[in-house]
Amino acid sequence: MALRRPMVAGNWKMNGSAQLAQELFNKFATKLQDDSVEVVLCPPSIYLESVRQLLDENKETLNGCLVRMGTQNLSQHDFGAYTGEISGQMLKDSGCRYVIIGHSERRRMYGETSNIVAEKFAAAQKHGLTPILCVGESGPAREARRTFEVIAEELDVVIEKNGTMAFDNAIIAYEPLWAVGTGKSATPEQAQEVHAFIRKRLSEVSPFIGENIRILYGGSVTPSNAADLFAQPDVDGGLIGGVSLNATEFLSLCTIAMSA
């Protein structure tokens, strides 16, 4: 069985502040003892420089702990007249290692199709960023028992454009739309069932990738349910929304992941 290092990624969405970043780093020094968990902060782009400075200033106090910087979106284009967009190269230059791709809010609110998501996935990897690819079904799709069908379709578009081996440098986040921001989380059994399906589907085309890719769960993860979720054999951590804005609770999730 592969040894997959747990990851806890905080998606601040359009929230947070430079003060929140400082509060998190103050707690990292006391709560994170080693590299057994990888922590990723994904603030709004305006705060990337603040987080980067804190990473530089706290190298010694972090003492080998894996705290990385990510972002919430990128353009599928390298450059050009795309007002308000940020390219993969710009994000790489800012110090980002990860980028969230295909979050349900981007798909729903901004009309990002699976083809656009696949293009953004490719753009991220072209510029040395690791995509965190979000997939997940709506409430009606789950009720119609179409969960696996929806997720397979979302994965297949990315595979068709980028090839299976592109997942050798990628993270997948299962975020059921009916659990994102609703306070209603998937049960550990529901999460495990879908994570196992994702791993099996990738294993069919590449056993190595299927075994080694990290699959996060996202959707109303809290300190009260994280231990049971993270204990599932195919759940490798979480993509965290609201709780990532509370330094104490977010660090609780990190420590839970360390012992999962």
Curated annotation (Swiss-Prot):
A Pfam family assignment: TIM
Keywords for the protein's UniProt record, in alphabetical order: Cytoplasm, Gluconeogenesis, Glycolysis, Isomerase
HAMAP family: TIM_B
Family as reported in the entry's similarity comment: Belongs to the triosephosphate isomerase family.
Residues of the active site: H103, E175
Function: Involved in the gluconeogenesis. Catalyzes stereospecifically the conversion of dihydroxyacetone phosphate (DHAP) to D-glyceraldehyde-3-phosphate (G3P).
GO molecular function term, any single one: triose-phosphate isomerase activity
Top-level taxon of the source organism: Bacteria
Localization per Swiss-Prot or TrEMBL: Cytoplasm
Assembly description: Homodimer.
CDD domains for the chain: TIM (cd00311)
Name of the protein described by the UniProt record: Triosephosphate isomerase
EC number: 5.3.1.1
SUPFAM superfamilies: Triosephosphate isomerase (TIM)
Pathway annotation from the record: Carbohydrate biosynthesis; gluconeogenesis; Carbohydrate degradation; glycolysis; D-glyceraldehyde 3-phosphate from glycerone phosphate: step 1/1
InterPro entries: Aldolase_TIM, TIM_sf, TrioseP_Isoase_bac/euk, Triosephosphate_isomerase, Triosephosphate_isomerase_AS
Catalysed reactions, as listed in the record: D-glyceraldehyde 3-phosphate = dihydroxyacetone phosphate
Residue sites binding substrate per the record: N11, W12, K13, G181, S220, G241, G242
UniProt-listed GO biological process terms: gluconeogenesis; glyceraldehyde-3-phosphate biosynthetic process; glycerol catabolic process; glycolytic process
Stretches assigned to coiled coil: none
Any one GO cellular component localisation term in the record: cytosol
Provenance organism: Shewanella pealeana (strain ATCC 700345 / ANG-SQ1)
Record bears the keyword Cytoplasm: yes
Primary location recorded for the protein, binned into one broad class: cytoplasm
